[in-house]
Amino acid sequence: MSVIHTTEYGNGYSLDQLIGDSGDIYYRACKDSVCRYAEDHYIAMMYLEGMGWDPKQQDPQ
């Protein structure tokens, strides 16, 4: 798996877009070193919110 794009949201929150060896796209939502993987961007954003990220208070950097 390789990272295509990373978005840092501050306070340890980040979202990586990954591509697998077979060409499939995945997402990795992280808070510090705790990460969850998803095949869908919407689900990955829900994971970030579940980890405590508030999209109304933080802008991507």
Describe each PLM feature range.
Residues Y26-Q57:
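A short, charged, amphipathic alpha-helix used as a generic interaction element across diverse proteins
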Residues M1-R28, C35, P60:
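Short N-terminal "domain-start" leader segments
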